[in-house]
């Protein structure tokens, strides 16, 4: 299957989500379970009410079977996210530090483990959306300061970079073409000046 042009140079949303699901998260098992050997990962022996870290995708499966509760990451709460939002407002040229997959993990937990979150989900969704929007505005403003060789995207998450990448590549290609065009004109101008100097030298000798 041929991907649309805007997706050929970036990951699909499902691929970004897949990568996020492989990160580890803490769970609180409701029952004891024997160790599992899976392709590419292992699930340690689980004991009831004893915290353990496992991949998010496994935690979601166990959660759906009522076999565990998911312990939310320290950053997934209203106080922390509001602080980050304030940081974004105070630092117009810098992004606040957030986990690499904060958007995807937030989405997964809000959809699959809402009852394990300490704050109302509608408030969490609201502040996450506000945070995402202000970071998007800042990143687009930052594109105005692009040059043809690099762009500074420190602090952005994988999903945020992935969403910007097609546009960034297009802009950088245009800037590179413009840069090359200016250099070509400059080289031609230098060549003409040298020809003029040679002409004057010949005239003086005559």
Curated annotation (Swiss-Prot):
Keywords: Chromosome partition, DNA replication, Nucleus. Gene3D superfamilies: 1.20.58.1020, 3.40.5.50. Component of the GINS complex which is a heterotetramer of SLD5, PSF1, PSF2 and PSF3. Its main location: nucleus. The GINS complex plays an essential role in the initiation of DNA replication. Has a role in chromosome segregation. It comes from Debaryomyces hansenii (strain ATCC 36239 / CBS 767 / BCRC 21394 / JCM 1990 / NBRC 0083 / IGC 2968) (Yeast). It holds the Pfam family Sld5. Residues 182-206 are annotated as: Disordered. GO terms for biological process: chromosome segregation; double-strand break repair via break-induced replication; nuclear DNA replication. This is DNA replication complex GINS protein PSF2. One of its GO terms (cellular component) is CMG complex. Residues 197-206 have a biased composition (Basic and acidic residues). InterPro entries: GINS_A (IPR021151), GINS_bundle-like_dom_sf (IPR036224), GINS_Psf2 (IPR007257), PSF2_N (IPR056784). Belongs to the GINS2/PSF2 family. It is found in: Nucleus. The lineage of its organism: Eukaryota, Fungi, Dikarya, Ascomycota, Saccharomycotina.
């Amino acid at each position: 299957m041929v991907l649309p042009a805007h997706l050929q140079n970036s990951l699909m949303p499902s691929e970004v989500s897949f990568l996020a699901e492989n990160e580890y998260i803490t769970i609180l098992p409701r029952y004891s379970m024997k160790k599992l050997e899976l392709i590419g990962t292992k699930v340690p022996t689980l004991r009831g009410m004893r915290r353990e870290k496992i991949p998010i995708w496994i935690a979601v499966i166990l959660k759906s079977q009522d076999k565990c509760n998911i312990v939310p990451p320290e950053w997934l709460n209203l106080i922390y996210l509001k602080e980050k939002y304030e940081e974004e407002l105070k630092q117009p040229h810098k992004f606040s530090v957030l986990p690499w997959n904060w958007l995807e993990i937030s989405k997964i937990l809000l959809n699959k483990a809402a009852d394990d979150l300490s704050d109302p989900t509608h408030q969490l969704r609201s502040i996450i959306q506000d945070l995402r929007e202000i970071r998007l505005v800042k990143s687009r403003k930052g594109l105005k300061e692009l040059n043809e060789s690099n762009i500074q995207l420190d602090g952005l998450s994988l999903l945020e970079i992935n969403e910007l990448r097609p546009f960034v590549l297009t802009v950088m290609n245009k800037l590179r073409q413009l840069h090359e065009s200016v250099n070509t004109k400059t080289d031609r101008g230098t060549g003409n000046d040298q020809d003029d100097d040679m002409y004057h030298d010949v005239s003086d000798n005559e």
